[in-house]
Amino acid sequence: MRLQTIAPAKVNLVLRVGPPRRDGYHGIRSLMVPLDLGDRVDVSVGERAGPVTCRVPGRPELDGADNLAARAAERFRARFGVERTIGIRIAKRIPVTAGLGGGSSDAAAVLRCLARAFGIRDRAALAAIALEVGSDVPFFLGPGPAWAEGRGERLTPADVPPQHLVLVYPDDPALAIRAGEAYRWLDASRQGRRPRLPPRFARFEPSRAGNDLQPPCLLERPPLATLLGLLVGRGATAAIMSGSGPTVFGTFHSRNAAARAARTIAEEVVDRKVMVLAATTVRRHPGVTPWRSPRSASSPSTKRS
């Protein structure tokens, strides 16, 4: 049996971060939205017992058991007693380690495919597996615009009109940011202050965009401020970093305005290792079979590191 789906990228239009908790995690309140940009994920289920394999053509460093997609398949097999071979093939379009959720989305795509292949209808169990794999994975089981709270596992659907974006991703190891680093920088910058998370709001406007991780990350990675300036200079109504970065993005009034800005910025950064993409937020990617996880799932998770 072979199944295929799209694993959409995401951006955090809003990311508010609380103080560290006793368990080492940070509580968040984040407005996450999927994009019309995504990876293609193929999952093949064999008839005989055997291993999980994972290949990412053109990106051999992503092959194998350490890929989140492979981990998701292994946890699915353990939870539901599956022994048959599972082959995963991922055609990557989402930049890697970019704050766009590519790895988490691939993992959720595999879970969606396997749930269909084996007729699994236990949504709570699937959400628990997703949370074991990573904090962002439950969001991608839907996925649709949602407020993510707790560690990211408590999801509340959100009304987000289509937003026309330009994504700017610096493909430079010197600008890479691990999520754990970003949270540590934020904690250090607060100097012991423990701010409360602001409430959710009913409808998104660009003026509400914001990311608590951005100020400390800009201090540690100053070139990101230059990229944000390019977006503002080309008419972005808001420009922020997505997640823990290093991708930054701007919102624009229309798809045409975003496309023009993307072309101009691409010309301005042609001599640098920078990827520029125009994208639009969606209520649901047409290539995704929906699977909404419950509001919460009680399960261990992986810490941000």
From Swiss-Prot:
Binding site for ATP: 95-105
Protein's UniProt keywords contain Zinc-finger: no
Renumbered residue ranges of the record's region Disordered: 286-305
Keywords noted in UniProt: ATP-binding, Isoprene biosynthesis, Kinase, Nucleotide-binding, Transferase
EC numbers for this chain: 2.7.1.148
GO biological process, one term: terpenoid biosynthetic process
Catalyzed reactions per annotation: 4-CDP-2-C-methyl-D-erythritol + ATP = 4-CDP-2-C-methyl-D-erythritol 2-phosphate + ADP + H(+)
InterPro entries: GHMP_kinase_C_dom, GHMP_kinase_C_sf, GHMP_kinase_N_dom, IspE, Ribosomal_Su5_D2-typ_SF, Ribsml_uS5_D2-typ_fold_subgr
Active site annotation, chain numbering: 10, 136
Keyword Cytoplasm belongs to the record: no
A Pfam cross-reference name: GHMP_kinases_N
Compositional bias segments (type: Low complexity): 290-305
Function: Catalyzes the phosphorylation of the position 2 hydroxy group of 4-diphosphocytidyl-2C-methyl-D-erythritol.
NCBIfam families: ispE (TIGR00154)
Cross-referenced HAMAP family: IspE
Designated name of the protein: 4-diphosphocytidyl-2-C-methyl-D-erythritol kinase
Protein's organism: Anaeromyxobacter sp. (strain Fw109-5)
